[in-house]
Amino acid sequence: KRLKSGLTNLLSNKDITIFDGEASFINKNEISIKNRNKVIKISSNNIIISTGSKPFFPDNLKPNNKRIVDSDYVLNSKELPSSICILGGGYIGIEFAYLYNSFGVDVTIVESTNSILGFVDNEIVNELRKNYLKNGIKILESTKINEIDEKDDSISISFSNVNDQVDLNFDLLLLSTGRIPNTDNLELKNTKVKTDNFGFIKVDNKYLTNIDNIYAIGDVIGGSMLAHKASEEGSKVIEGIINPDIIKEDFIVPACIYCQP
């Protein structure tokens, strides 16, 4: 709340008008903003989509905020579980594994592919894996969930890989299975903006969609889902709108995983 309030004040001081609500496209120049029983329509020569992303969940596995939870739930939780199974060995799963382990929680990471952090250099992954195992974090790679039995006081999970099958009990199952773009409620069909099979908006090297006045930046276009990347992309878009002849320069996006080491 403090961060949101600070950003709101910063934008307001720059004479930027803020509308609270859910926006959707009417056409390529006009959007509708719904806030409770009120609907506002605004139009613009240029529109930038930066609606971010949300957690992705497998079709047969959804959070219920009881024994099966997502990252939003655990960040707002006031109690620590005694044990947790983290499904997904990407950025989010690795960071939460470190966090819970630091608080003394028994942590198990389950990754369906043959390696956690599959997008990171092997040398880094091997060092991190060695450190996690040393600190008591269990890592199950090339492993899939077969069956879940949710009880009042625990959750029983059946796992399997090419060599073995095992049943384990946990207090919580944290789903950290990736993120998908927030595009499903934008009514993009009213603009004919193109997306890929996952809903990510397609853009060119100036972040322009296939529609000549609609741009997209940040998580909604895929790639590295980082706030500072989206901020830089936003600056590039504004520069391009002001000066259409500007040449886009590629930039390297620094990233880190919040854990030790």
Regions of interest found by a model, annotated:
Residues 15-17, 54-56, 194-196, 244-253:
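A short alpha-helix-loop-beta-strand transition element characteristic
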